């Protein structure tokens, strides 16, 4: 239900993430997209910037909607309200700290470091795509160092 979700998305948060109230209200509910999300995240790797936060948030939202973590032998299928979060979970913030000669590891700083546009920074889709790009750039940088 959208009403439940709206309690967790303030106007300020929507603005930071570049959503309008209309876009938020027109978007599908978590219940509608949960089966597809569960299917996509059960096989790793999962790459994120401070990925532990993202994983905890996903677990929290799944639980709020009555999903349970699947046991090792349970299948994640549409309608069974189970989820698994895949491995490995790769944290680009930690990789930047370990491998890059930068003082800061936040995503915007890494965008600047790798000449990635800041135009839509904080929009969920852009952040996800840029995080993937940062991951590849860190791996490329590290392979050239060796």
Outline where the language-model segments fall.
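Conserved non-catalytic scaffold segment of RNase H-like nuclease domains
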Residues: 1-59, 108, 112-118, 122
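Short, surface-exposed acidic
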Residues: 21-24, 69-74, 78-85, 118-122
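A short secondary-structure junction motif
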Residues: 57-67
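Short alpha-helix plus adjacent loop in nuclease-associated cores
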Residues: 76-104
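Acidic two-metal-ion nuclease catalytic site recognized across multiple nuclease folds
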Residues: 111-113, 129-146
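Acidic donor-binding loop at a coil-to-helix junction in glycosyltransferase catalytic cores
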Residues: 126
